[in-house]
């Protein structure tokens, strides 16, 4: 079934849809912007890209759909864990999408999602206020 036909079926009735604030969002896997649109839908396309946080809380997992084996959903996804510093991680994602000519329209969205995940994994430094001297009278 073509992606356009699947989109016509799925766009208004899906278990992943969330409608609030006069907008429609989607919680499906591999939807980089969580938007209910044809481009970012993670279910209907033959090639999809997803970025998730790694299980151990350090790094990201890039999920890509294989071109071959579309009829076998259990083996149709390739998961690559990237556990480097932020610049190298974003560069790796950029190269995975650009060098393989794999959905270049999703490159910037994947980089932004990975950047947000990496930023959330950074430890928060607590700023201590300098203690005020006590008044001596």
UniProtKB/Swiss-Prot annotation:
GO terms for cellular component: cytosolic large ribosomal subunit. Keywords: Acetylation, Cytoplasm, Isopeptide bond, Phosphoprotein, Ribonucleoprotein, Ribosomal protein, Ubl conjugation. It is found in: Cytoplasm. One of its GO terms (biological process) is translation. Its main location: cytoplasm. Component of the large ribosomal subunit. The ribosome is a large ribonucleoprotein complex responsible for the synthesis of proteins in the cell. This is Large ribosomal subunit protein eL28.
């Amino acid at each position: 079934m073509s992606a356009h036909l699947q989109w016509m079926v799925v766009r208004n009735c899906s278990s992943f849809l969330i409608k609030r604030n006069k907008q429609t969002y989607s919680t499906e896997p591999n939807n980089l912007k969580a938007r209910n649109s044809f481009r970012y839908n993670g279910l209907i396309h033959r090639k999809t890209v997803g970025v998730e946080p790694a299980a151990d809380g350090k790094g990201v997992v890039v999920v890509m759909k294989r071109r071959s084996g579309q009829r076998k959903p259990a083996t149709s996804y390739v998961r690559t864990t990237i556990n480097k510093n932020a610049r190298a991680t974003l560069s790796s994602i950029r190269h995975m999408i650009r060098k393989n000519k794999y959905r270049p329209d999703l490159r910037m969205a994947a980089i932004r999602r990975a950047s947000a995940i990496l930023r959330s994994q950074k430890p928060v430094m607590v700023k201590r206020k300098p203690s005020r001297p006590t008044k001596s009278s």
